[in-house]
Design a protein with these regions (language model features):
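Non-catalytic signal-transmission and effector/linker regions of two-component phosphorelay proteins
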Residues: 1-14, 78, 116-129
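Charged docking surfaces used in two-component/phosphorelay signaling
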Residues: 24-32
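Short hydrophobic/Thr-rich beta-strand motif most characteristic of the beta2 strand and flanking loop
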Residues: 34-41, 49
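Acidic catalytic/metal-coordinating carboxylates
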Residues: 41-45, 68-74
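Active-site residues of response regulator receiver
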Residues: 61
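Receiver (REC) domain active-site loop signature in two-component systems and cognate sites
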Residues: 64
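Hydrophobic/aromatic residues positioned on beta-strands within the core alpha/beta folds
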Residues: 90-91
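A Lys-centered signature of the CheY-like receiver
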Residues: 113
């Protein structure tokens, strides 16, 4: 990927998680590995961002106050279907029936919190290709 000036464009990751500390940690790890990262705690605000910004990967919490990850995904799927394959879900939930059903219907990886750095980087590399 190149910018109009010919230099390589950094891949951009959108992190949607209401856990500010974890989202910041993910962001710092990604920046150390050459990514640009945007953190958004509110999924509704993140939806607006996705409509007008290029994104190479989306890390999304499954359970959030304003809009849960499954509904966020469904909205993105309708508005920007090309991003569906770029999702990575994270969750601290053990087994929630609603989310389990959703997870079984999508082809996005689900990482359990706490997430190993190596696992996070591998999944972001895969999603951002």
């Amino acid at each position: 990927m190149e910018t109009s000036g010919g230099s390589p464009r950094k891949r951009h990751v959108l992190i949607v998680d209401d856990n500010a500390e974890l989202a910041w940690f993910f962001s710092e790890i990604l920046k150390l590995h050459g990514y640009e990262a945007t953190v958004m705690a509110d999924a509704v605000v993140a939806l607006k961002h996705l409509l007008s910004h290029a994104t190479d990967a989306v890390i999304c919490d499954l359970q959030m106050p304003s809009l849960d990850g499954d509904l966020f995904f469904a909205t993105v799927e309708r508005a920007r279907p090309e991003l569906v394959r770029r999702f990575i879900f994270v969750t601290g939930l053990a087994e929630d029936v609603r989310f389990h059903k959703f997870i079984s219907t999508v082809e996005a990886p689900v990482l359990r919190k706490p997430v190993a750095v190596e696992t996070l980087l591998a999944e972001v590399d895969r999603a951002a290709r």
